[in-house]
A protein has these predicted regions:
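Sec-dependent bacterial lipoprotein signal peptides
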Residues: 2-36
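Substrate-binding/active-site groove segments that recognize
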Residues: 103-120, 135
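Export/targeting segments at the very N-terminus of extracytoplasmic proteins
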Residues: 37-91
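Short, functionally critical alpha-helical segments immediately adjacent to catalytic or ligand/cofactor-binding
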Residues: 70-73, 77-97, 112, 132-136, ...
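Substrate-binding/catalytic groove segments of enzymes
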Residues: 118-119, 142-152, 162-165, 188-190
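A short, structured beta-strand-centered segment in the mid-to-C-terminal lobe
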Residues: 122-131
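Acidic helix/loop microenvironments that form the catalytic cleft of cell-wall polysaccharide enzymes
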Residues: 94, 148-173
């Protein structure tokens, strides 16, 4: 005679259904989030989407947004950086002013300090394409060193040595990274 515990079998079935439901829910959420916040389609379509997002999220002029969007996407793809993260970094660094120059000598859209990056970023840093490409290179380099995008963005602001050296500099870098992430979130909502 075999004894079957129906309450035990019901519990197993209930757990299996709950697990399936949870997995399906997570898939639906992930798909809907990526559909809302990512660039898709052909290169021209992604450039147009990003241009529209820059105009709506950051009030970038249509001419500037249309000119810079393809450069941002090309540089982001070349260095395996999210185009929305690179666009948010530009918003934070220069507010899309290609002639920007900081008191410390940082130049252009991504505010590159030429003395630090001269070897790996040759060319005129006031040239928008050169500058965006260099910013993507720097961010990618820091990501490989830091292991996370948040830390890479903090490094972009204070450098890896500054980040490691003191609590206050690390705090400044983390605050900067939160600001860039906020700009990225704003852009993704506008896409």
């Amino acid at each position: 005679m075999q004894i079957v515990s129906t309450s035990s079998n019901q519990g197993i079935a209930s757990n299996a259904l709950g697990s399936i439901f949870l997995k399906l829910s997570l898939i639906v959420i992930a798909v809907s989030l990526s559909a809302c916040s990512s660039l898709s389609g052909s290169f021209a379509n992604r450039s147009n989407q990003l241009s529209s997002g820059l105009q709506n999220a950051y009030s970038v002029s249509p001419n500037t947004a249309n000119r810079l969007s393809p450069m941002i996407i090309q540089s982001a793809e070349r260095y395996d950086v999210s185009p929305t993260l690179l666009a948010a970094l530009i918003r934070q660094e220069s507010n899309y002013n290609s002639a920007a120059r900081s008191p410390t000598g940082a130049i252009g859209l991504t505010q590159i300090i030429s003395s630090h990056w001269r070897q790996s970023c040759p060319g005129d840093l006031y040239d928008e394409n050169v500058n965006i490409n260099c910013g993507a290179h720097v961010l990618s380099t820091y990501y490989r060193s830091a292991g996370s995008w948040s830390k890479a963005v903090a490094y972009y602001n204070v450098g890896p040595t500054g980040y490691q050296r003191s609590f206050w500099t690390r705090h400044k870098g983390k605050k900067y990274a939160r600001s860039v992430k906020h700009h990225e979130k704003t852009l993704k909502k506008a896409l």
